[in-house]
Regions:
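Positively charged, polar, low-complexity stretches
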Residues: 1-127
Length: 127
Protein backbone atom coordinates (compact mmCIF):
# COMPACT_ATOMS: atom_id res chain seq x y z
CA UNK A 1 0.00 0.00 0.00
CA UNK A 2 1.20 3.52 -0.81
CA UNK A 3 0.23 6.86 0.68
CA UNK A 4 1.30 10.21 -0.74
CA UNK A 5 1.85 13.34 1.33
CA UNK A 6 1.95 16.50 -0.78
CA UNK A 7 4.42 19.07 0.53
CA UNK A 8 2.54 21.78 -1.37
CA UNK A 9 -0.44 21.28 0.93
CA UNK A 10 1.23 22.44 4.16
CA UNK A 11 3.44 25.27 5.36
CA UNK A 12 3.74 24.44 9.07
CA UNK A 13 3.57 21.52 11.48
CA UNK A 14 -0.14 21.86 12.18
CA UNK A 15 -0.92 21.77 8.46
CA UNK A 16 1.40 18.75 8.10
CA UNK A 17 -0.69 16.93 10.71
CA UNK A 18 -3.84 17.87 8.80
CA UNK A 19 -2.31 16.40 5.63
CA UNK A 20 -1.43 13.21 7.51
CA UNK A 21 -5.03 13.03 8.70
CA UNK A 22 -6.33 13.54 5.17
CA UNK A 23 -3.99 10.97 3.63
CA UNK A 24 -3.47 8.26 6.24
CA UNK A 25 -6.70 8.21 8.21
CA UNK A 26 -9.11 9.65 5.62
CA UNK A 27 -10.11 12.60 7.77
CA UNK A 28 -10.92 10.56 10.87
CA UNK A 29 -10.22 12.32 14.14
CA UNK A 30 -6.79 11.81 15.64
CA UNK A 31 -4.77 13.84 18.14
CA UNK A 32 -2.60 15.60 15.51
CA UNK A 33 0.63 15.73 17.50
CA UNK A 34 4.07 14.14 17.44
CA UNK A 35 3.23 11.34 19.88
CA UNK A 36 -0.01 10.51 18.06
CA UNK A 37 1.87 10.39 14.75
CA UNK A 38 4.35 7.97 16.30
CA UNK A 39 1.47 5.78 17.53
CA UNK A 40 -0.27 5.94 14.16
CA UNK A 41 2.87 4.87 12.30
CA UNK A 42 3.45 2.01 14.72
CA UNK A 43 0.12 0.57 13.58
CA UNK A 44 -2.25 -1.78 15.30
CA UNK A 45 -5.19 0.64 15.24
CA UNK A 46 -6.75 -0.77 12.08
CA UNK A 47 -6.53 2.65 10.42
CA UNK A 48 -3.59 1.89 8.14
CA UNK A 49 -1.86 -1.32 7.01
CA UNK A 50 0.88 -2.71 9.22
CA UNK A 51 3.41 -2.10 6.42
CA UNK A 52 3.24 0.63 3.79
CA UNK A 53 5.20 3.06 1.65
CA UNK A 54 4.91 6.77 2.44
CA UNK A 55 5.84 9.02 -0.46
CA UNK A 56 6.50 12.62 0.56
CA UNK A 57 6.24 14.70 -2.62
CA UNK A 58 7.76 18.19 -2.80
CA UNK A 59 10.04 17.22 0.07
CA UNK A 60 12.50 20.03 -0.64
CA UNK A 61 9.68 22.57 -0.29
CA UNK A 62 8.74 20.92 3.00
CA UNK A 63 12.36 21.08 4.14
CA UNK A 64 12.23 24.85 3.64
CA UNK A 65 8.76 25.39 5.14
CA UNK A 66 9.49 23.15 8.13
CA UNK A 67 12.94 24.66 8.58
CA UNK A 68 14.36 26.89 11.29
CA UNK A 69 11.58 29.50 11.29
CA UNK A 70 8.99 26.80 11.98
CA UNK A 71 11.32 25.07 14.42
CA UNK A 72 11.70 28.29 16.43
CA UNK A 73 7.92 28.73 16.42
CA UNK A 74 7.35 25.17 17.64
CA UNK A 75 10.06 25.28 20.31
CA UNK A 76 8.83 28.66 21.58
CA UNK A 77 5.38 27.13 21.99
CA UNK A 78 6.83 24.05 23.68
CA UNK A 79 8.86 26.21 26.04
CA UNK A 80 5.67 27.87 27.31
CA UNK A 81 3.93 24.55 27.94
CA UNK A 82 6.66 22.02 28.69
CA UNK A 83 7.20 20.10 31.89
CA UNK A 84 9.81 21.75 34.14
CA UNK A 85 12.17 18.80 33.60
CA UNK A 86 12.23 19.59 29.85
CA UNK A 87 12.73 23.34 30.23
CA UNK A 88 16.51 23.43 29.88
CA UNK A 89 16.63 20.94 26.99
CA UNK A 90 13.92 22.86 25.12
CA UNK A 91 15.61 26.20 25.78
CA UNK A 92 18.92 24.88 24.42
CA UNK A 93 17.20 23.49 21.33
CA UNK A 94 15.51 26.87 20.81
CA UNK A 95 18.81 28.68 21.21
CA UNK A 96 20.39 26.44 18.57
CA UNK A 97 17.45 26.86 16.18
CA UNK A 98 17.66 30.64 16.52
CA UNK A 99 21.26 30.33 15.28
CA UNK A 100 20.21 28.07 12.40
CA UNK A 101 21.72 25.00 14.04
CA UNK A 102 20.42 21.62 15.09
CA UNK A 103 17.54 19.56 13.75
CA UNK A 104 14.50 21.23 12.22
CA UNK A 105 10.85 20.23 12.34
CA UNK A 106 11.42 18.56 8.97
CA UNK A 107 14.30 16.58 10.46
CA UNK A 108 12.20 15.58 13.48
CA UNK A 109 9.51 14.19 11.19
CA UNK A 110 11.89 12.35 8.86
CA UNK A 111 13.66 10.73 11.81
CA UNK A 112 10.37 9.76 13.46
CA UNK A 113 8.99 8.20 10.28
CA UNK A 114 12.30 6.48 9.48
CA UNK A 115 12.42 4.86 12.92
CA UNK A 116 9.43 2.71 11.96
CA UNK A 117 10.67 -0.40 10.13
CA UNK A 118 7.14 -1.01 8.83
CA UNK A 119 7.17 2.30 6.91
CA UNK A 120 9.22 2.87 3.78
CA UNK A 121 9.70 6.64 3.45
CA UNK A 122 10.50 8.09 0.03
CA UNK A 123 11.36 11.79 -0.15
CA UNK A 124 10.60 13.04 -3.65
CA UNK A 125 11.07 16.46 -5.18
CA UNK A 126 8.23 17.41 -7.50
CA UNK A 127 5.33 15.28 -8.65
Amino acid sequence: MEYVLDGKRFDNLEEFYAEVGRVLVSGKLWDENFDALNDLLRGGFGLIPDEFRLIWRHAERSRERLGYTETVRQLTSQLRDCHPTMLIKTAWALRAALRGQGPTVFDWLVVLISEHPNVELLLVEGD
